[in-house]
């Protein structure tokens, strides 16, 4: 690995640890030329399935879009970034585990609602109201009643 400070090609690994529930390796490295230290993270690059939208268009899976939707739902709620990242990891793992090359956007929405239900009930209702396009108060009541079961 090239040193980010002096661009030397020779660095040595000082320390390695598993992070992100064992899905990444954190390595502490030192340049043999300038002796600066830096951290790298290594993880498997896994291919996500393409997303089939409601209008039948297809697009690449966008993790930022998934994260943004979850962040909007949990905004100002007592949900830590670690909890949110774990939920995102579960969603992505479930999508990969289907083995499909393409998945419906509806499946992603349902997985997001499932994770939000476990994280925070208010965040779940927020997301469901937009995702399911609630039009009146009775639909909110039905969603809340479903949570109370």
Swiss-Prot record:
Pfam family for this entry, one: Zn_ribbon_NrdR
Co-factor requirement: Zn(2+)
Cofactor note text: Binds 1 zinc ion.
Role, per record: Negatively regulates transcription of bacterial ribonucleotide reductase nrd genes and operons by binding to NrdR-boxes.
Zn-finger region bounds: unnamed: 3-34
A molecular function GO annotation: DNA binding
Similarity remark: Belongs to the NrdR family.
Lineage of origin: Bacteria, Pseudomonadati, Pseudomonadota, Gammaproteobacteria, Alteromonadales
GO BP of this protein: negative regulation of DNA-templated transcription
Name of the protein this chain belongs to: Transcriptional repressor NrdR
